Regions:
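Short amphipathic alpha-helical interaction/hinge segments
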Residues: 149, 206-209
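Short cysteine/histidine-rich metal-coordination sites, predominantly Zn2+-binding motifs
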Residues: 187-188, 209-215
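Local cysteine-cluster metal-coordination motifs and their immediate loop/turn environment
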Residues: 104, 180-203
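ATP-dependent adenylation/nucleotidyltransferase module used to activate substrates
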Residues: 1-175
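A polyampholytic, Gly/Pro-enriched intrinsically disordered region
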Residues: 81, 174-178, 202-206
Length: 215
């Protein structure tokens, strides 16, 4: 299998699972620093997993987003609401058009390196509150990337129809060490267990029968 893809890698459960799942086709992974509460912790995990697989890790600064965009995810731990992802208050964590911006940069980076595709690890649980994770967006962005690059790059999003629990099950099969992933929107040393992404993380791990000590 040719290593022809660039993965957008946050360091969370989903993109880390995709890194291990598709390591045979991933030439490099890119992590974006955009000023979120959990960026630093996520990036540490992203780099660690790339090192384990011998995949090149690239870090790109998008700090202008943290300075100019409105989102509780950019406003410090105290601004993060608690509850499930489908709760109305979790909409405050949306960073406007985050995936669109990251995919555009990733597409330019991939074409500059002579790669054929960009990969993103959105999943069905994201669709409720994140417009730029929905199948319609992925389809439209994929067309824009193909039309806007000389080599007609492909946008691959193989987890779009999967739940986070199903992704965790796949990670378990692959032997992914989820203690080297980070999800909490508050950005603390340990997962708070109360914000939407922590709740979803816990439910996914339980679904897959995975127990993490001191998470």
């Amino acid at each position: 299998m040719a290593k022809d893809a660039l993965l957008v890698l946050s360091g969370g459960m989903d993109s880390t699972t995709m890194l291990w799942d598709y390591a045979g086709s991933i030439a490099a992974a890119v992590t974006f620093q955009y000023g979120s509460n959990h960026n630093i912790r996520e990036a540490e995990c992203a780099r660690w997993n790339c090192e384990q697989l011998g995949i090149e890790w690239i870090e790109i600064d998008l700090s202008f987003m943290g300075k100019h965009f409105k989102s509780s995810l950019l406003d410090g731990a105290d601004a993060i609401p608690e509850g499930n992802y489908d709760d109305e208050n979790m909409r405050s964590t949306v960073v406007p058009f985050r995936n669109g911006i990251m995919l555009a940069v990733a597409a330019g980076l991939a074409e500059s390196r002579g790669l054929k595709a960009v990969m993103i690890a959105n999943h069905s649980g994201d669709h409720a509150i994140y417009p730029d994770c929905r199948p319609e967006f992925v389809s439209s962005m994929g067309k824009a990337i193909a039309d806007g690059t000389y080599e007609h790059l492909e946008l691959r999003a193989p987890y779009t129809g999967m739940t986070k629990g199903e992704i965790a099950c796949r990670g378990k099969e692959l032997g992914v060490d989820y203690s080297h992933t980070y999800s909490c929107y508050k950005g603390g040393e340990h997962h708070c267990g109360k914000c939407g992404t922590c709740v979803e993380r816990r439910e996914a791990l339980e679904f897959a029968g995975i127990t993490l000590d001191n998470d």
